[in-house]
């Protein structure tokens, strides 16, 4: 199986740095897949559950938030604001964040408030989705 190097980093830590066979993620346009030999690519990511298939084809799932993903020279680098493995997610905290975001969307006062609330809701929903997997 063809493989490539994957690095997922946040301002606080590196979550993964190793060989993988496939990555499935999401940007504002929709889902995308990265395989070995992918053409150079740069995109902004959105909060989602990112799927990582290791060199043996086994899947791991990771919450990734907003940030950038770069593909170059058979290496994929995620620089995201936050990322968490399923066991690191505080389900109660994510549920509270979801409820707060939904309340802010109901009582929005301006466009900036709405954008922030939608982003917070997307983060919370992605964390909860990963926790349920």
Curated annotation (Swiss-Prot):
InterPro entries: ATP_F1_dsu/esu_C_sf, ATP_synth_F1_dsu/esu, ATP_synth_F1_dsu/esu_N, ATP_synth_F1_esu_C, ATPsynth_dsu/esu_N. F-type ATPases have 2 components, CF(1) - the catalytic core - and CF(0) - the membrane proton channel. CF(1) has five subunits: alpha(3), beta(3), gamma(1), delta(1), epsilon(1). CF(0) has three main subunits: a, b and c. Keywords: ATP synthesis, Cell membrane, CF(1), Hydrogen ion transport, Ion transport, Membrane, Transport. Belongs to the ATPase epsilon chain family. This is ATP synthase epsilon chain. It is a peripheral membrane protein. It comes from Clostridium perfringens (strain 13 / Type A). Produces ATP from ADP in the presence of a proton gradient across the membrane.
């Amino acid at each position: 199986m063809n493989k490539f190097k994957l690095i997922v980093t946040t301002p606080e830590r590196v979550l993964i740095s190793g060989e993988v066979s496939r990555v499935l993620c999401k940007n504002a346009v929709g889902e995308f897949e990265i395989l070995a030999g992918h053409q150079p690519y740069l995109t902004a990511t959105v909060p989602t559950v990112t799927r990582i298939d290791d060199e043996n084809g086994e899947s791991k799932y990771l919450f990734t938030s907003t940030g950038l993903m770069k593909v170059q020279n058979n290496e994929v680098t995620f620089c995201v604001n936050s990322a968490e493995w399923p066991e690191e997610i505080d389900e109660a905290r994510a549920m509270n964040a979801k409820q707060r975001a939904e309340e802010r969307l109901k009582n929005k006062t301006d466009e900036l408030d709405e954008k922030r609330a939608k982003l917070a809701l997307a983060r919370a929903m992605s964390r909860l989705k990963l926790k349920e997997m």
